[in-house]
């Protein structure tokens, strides 16, 4: 006979799985299912271990990971698998399918086109392929899935500008906005400020990785540059004046709990800034960052917030509202998504 605590745990897990969710911070190359990784490897003639346990050692973060750079090394294995349009379309479809399976209503999937240009694809061809996969997923599942284009902070500024310019000018593309990822420690916002301003002049919305490497100054610099969505912001912990500035400027936080504990951006739950941001009234969203690399999904993340912080269903509803309002969807799409979210959570006026 199942004990009452175990029964309650199963009920809660099922409840969280069935909750309608949204996600703003999900990396394509870090979120491929094992099944799709195997399919892509076969297409690329790359040998893989037969067992999933051995494959996991190649594509999930090692337990002894100490830094963000250690964590990022895991992506090197996936890069050769994403060098054709067919592979990119399959990958995009796979990630959106995973999200839809746990009732994600809206997702923004981000990736760096330059990482899929090793075999001759142009930046525009890369984005076209990803969009094709997401369009198929939207037809097959009840999900809205959009593309975010990442620049790699450590790459040539000229290369990033050229890629962004080409993509922005391509009338065939429907991508939602821009982001900057990669080596934050050596390339803080001030170092790439001209690149950020260039991107802002393209008249597309943008988000930005900041505060993932223990540097609260990077969050302050990002806010000063006028960026209204920031990924991670982990280093804001124990900086009340910065939190106040964050709230005053109406910036939205893309929190990634599991990932931050793995990269040691937060060395413990006590250093993860959720509670401080929550109490200050900050705009919070919950995200996976990398489903496969971090061995997580949104249901697992929600469970952690319940277990660690006592997060309520009302909180989850509010965080999903935040995500839709801060999303790079159109105003018409936002209104429709908010109405669907409200209905799903049984909210009334």
From Swiss-Prot:
Cofactor(s) it depends on: Zn(2+)
GO molecular function list: 2'-deoxyadenosine deaminase activity; adenosine deaminase activity; zinc ion binding
One record GO biological process: purine ribonucleoside monophosphate biosynthetic process
Leading EC class: hydrolase
EC numbers for this chain: 3.5.4.4
Residues flagged as site, Important for catalytic activity: 232
One of the Pfam families matching this protein, by short name: A_deaminase
Binding of substrate, residues: 27, 29, 182
Keywords: Hydrolase, Metal-binding, Nucleotide metabolism, Zinc
Active site as annotated: 212
InterPro entries given in the database record: A_deaminase, A_deaminase_dom, Ado/ade_deaminase, Metal_Hydrolase
Catalytic activity, as annotated: adenosine + H2O + H(+) = inosine + NH4(+); 2'-deoxyadenosine + H2O + H(+) = 2'-deoxyinosine + NH4(+)
Binding site for Zn(2+): 25, 27, 209, 289
Top-level taxon in the UniProt lineage: Bacteria
Cofactor note: Binds 1 zinc ion per subunit.
Role summary: Catalyzes the hydrolytic deamination of adenosine and 2-deoxyadenosine.
Family: Belongs to the metallo-dependent hydrolases superfamily. Adenosine and AMP deaminases family. Adenosine deaminase subfamily.
Name the UniProt record assigns to this protein: Adenosine deaminase
